[in-house]
Amino acid sequence: IKNKDHLGCCLVTGKEKQIIGRLHPVIKKVIGSHPKGALLVSFDKRSFESYGHDEGQGLNAPVSEYAAFAYGTALNCLLDDKKHVRMIGGTTIVYWAEKAKSAYQDIFNIFLSGEKESGRVSDQDLKGIITNILRGMPADLENVVIDPQEPFYILGLSPNAARLSVRFFLRNNFGKIL
């Protein structure tokens, strides 16, 4: 630990005595954001800082260096996968399954866009998959078992100057989201 490092409770992990990151990572490829990327968390004027937290930028939204690196890396990786990112209105929507199997994203993408990759899955197979999932039963997509209980996440981001706003964040079982 360096002299200027601040220790605190991380808002992401809930862990105490963590080194609080001073700056948050740049998030890239949010549609409509600055070409060099934008920040999810930032305070660029002293008037935006909380009273008593003016010793370091990171103290206004205390996130550990580890958690900031982790969320920045994961979010940039998800946004880099154009196949599973959609724009609705002014909101960039990114979605993923907890076990990181893209088959869940592929099925959800059909619901969002109404388009499916030609030849990948027939209409009949898709109907069977969706019927099983809606009944709470596992389904199979190209030898990947689709579990309706799999945790699934949907994040909506909107650009605002050099910052990003979280429009919504949903977490539920895949079957319930469908």
Language model segments and positions:
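Extended alpha-helical scaffolding segments
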Residues: 1, 17-178
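Flanking scaffold residues of small Cys/His-coordinated metal-binding clusters
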Residues: 4-5
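The −1 position to Zn-ligating cysteines in a subset of zinc-ribbon hairpins
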Residues: 9
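Short Cys/His-rich metal-coordination motifs, predominantly Zn2+-binding knuckles/fingers
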Residues: 13
